[in-house]
Structure formats: C-alpha cells, structure tokens
Design a protein with these regions (language model features):
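Conserved N-terminal entry element of GNAT/NAT acetyltransferase domains
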Residues: 1-32, 39, 43, 183, ...
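Acetyl-CoA-dependent GNAT
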Residues: 28-32, 38-39, 43-116, 127-129, ...
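Amphipathic alpha-helical recognition patches that constitute DNA-binding helices
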Residues: 36, 107, 142, 153
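Short hydrophobic/aromatic beta-strand or adjacent loop that forms the aromatic wall/cage
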Residues: 77, 180-184
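Conserved glycine-rich acetyl-CoA-binding loop
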Residues: 101, 110, 114-128, 137, ...
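Conserved GNAT acetyl-CoA-binding A-motif
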Residues: 134-146
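Conserved catalytic-core motifs of GNAT/GCN5-like acyltransferases
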Residues: 144-147, 159, 164-180
Length: 190
C-alpha cells in the first residue's frame, strides 16, 4: 500500500505544504466549537462563493452565539469537524426533517476542507461520519446533497462516495450577476 494511502487508512493526513504527517480527528461539533466553526465557515464562504448560499457579508453578520445554537446536536441536525490537533480544518453538516413521512431522508450540507488539507481524504472522512450519524442515530436510509455545476471536484468526490445525480435546478444561484445550476445527488443507505 502506498504510504499516503496507508496514512489515510489510519486516519492520518498531511497538509500539502510538505510538513510532517498530522493526525486528523473527526468529531461531532457542539456549542463550544462555535468560534472555530465560524472562522472556517467564513473562509469557506469567502473562498468558494458558488458553493455556499450566504454571501461573506451575510455570514459574517451571524454572531457566534447563533453559530453555537446551530452546532448543538439535536434529533434533526449534526455538524462534524476535522481537527489537526486543536485546529479545525474541515466541516460538514447533516440535517433531516422529523416529519414521519420524510424522516428517512437526510441532507448533507456545507462540506469544506481548508485548501492546505485537501487531497488527504478528509472530506471523505467527514462524509462518512455524517452518513453514519444519519443512519445510526436517526435511522435514515437516504441522503441527499446539492453541488454547484462548476464544482467538478466535489461532484467527483460525492460520486466516489456513492451519490448519484438525479436532477438539476437551472439558475439555482446568482453570484456576481452570473447564474449557476445546482445538481441534486442522492445516496441510498439501505
């Protein structure tokens, strides 16, 4: 097995800056993580404006205590973080609707990994954690997500995780006067 593949299998990742290997830990976030989550979320919205709905201005106006509420795990929402030591380097969320007829479905949202940590299978580990949570904690049998038409890397990642495109919403988002389509993807768990 290639050393990088072996490290990824052991949950270790290394930033692409050539620094020594780091151990990446994936865990459920809570209110205590609000400040570091907010910092990563603002970087995500700033560096990938076509991948996130809020603008940087809109998201930067959200106070830390509101992020704390959003991060508190419930029966309908959970957010996971990837940590290099104490530093949050990646995030994703999963939510579902508790109404009985659609409680079997959950939606993955907000997948982001800091640029220096990409290519180390961290996004896959975050998706695995969110998927396991939806299946095991909530009994979900189906996951959905959306990906912007220009984010080919993310779409390939989602396809490699078993997601299949099932539809496209034309002109779903307008960024700086340009319209973008959103692809809807689904994964059946059971």
């Amino acid at each position: 097995m290639h050393p990088a593949t072996a490290a990824a299998a052991r949950g270790q990742a290394r930033p692409s800056t050539g620094t020594p290997p780091m151990t990446i830990t994936i865990r459920l976030l809570d209110a205590a993580d609000a400040a570091c989550f907010r910092a990563v979320r603002l970087r995500a919205v700033d560096t990938a404006p076509t991948s996130f709905l809020p603008t940087l201005d809109e998201e930067s106006q959200v106070p830390v205590d509101e992020f704390a509420k959003r991060l508190t795990p419930t029966q309908v929402q959970a957010v996971f973080g990837a940590f290099d030591g104490e530093t949050l380097v990646g995030i994703t969320g999963v939510r579902r609707d508790a109404r009985t007829k659609i409680a079997h479905k959950a939606t993955i949202w907000g997948v982001y990994v800091d640029a220096a940590y990409r290519g180390q299978r961290i996004a896959q580990a975050l998706l695995d954690s969110a998927t396991a949570h939806a299946a095991n904690a909530w009994g979900c049998s189906q996951l959905m997500l959306c990906v912007n038409e220009v984010n080919h890397t993310a779409e390939r990642l989602y396809a490699s995780q078993g997601f299949v495109r099932f539809g496209t919403e034309p002109r779903s988002m307008c960024v700086d006067g340009r319209f973008y389509d959103e692809h809807y993807m689904i994964k059946t768990l059971a």
